[in-house]
């Protein structure tokens, strides 16, 4: 835990964020906790992690390499987190979305990171049900059985700017 804390602290030391640094620091650990839940639960094969900012290489507020480091600590380097974690951003969005759907349909376990603005309203992230899961599904209603499924789990990081305060 100390190694993780120190690594995040070093990555944020160059950021002149003041009070925002506390938020950025906590965002790293909230995201790592979401990944930890994904990693610990075998029944979670697809996890959508929605943040307010895309993690990018060498970004002083949310560096993807720092997240990879935290995720490697969680997995104890038992897997290549760069193959398990997918970034769904605006650059090549349709190709990335298609690739993610294909991997999930093939039964791969994926942790997908995106932001609210990229996914946007009306985007359908469902994917074809993997064969390994199809036979274990139980239909609980009279709706037509679908060949698509949603993500198994989702994490929403402080979606405060998406809702309107009416009081």
Residue ranges and their predicted role:
Residues 1-120, 127-136, 143-150, 160-167:
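Conserved C-terminal RecA-like helicase domain
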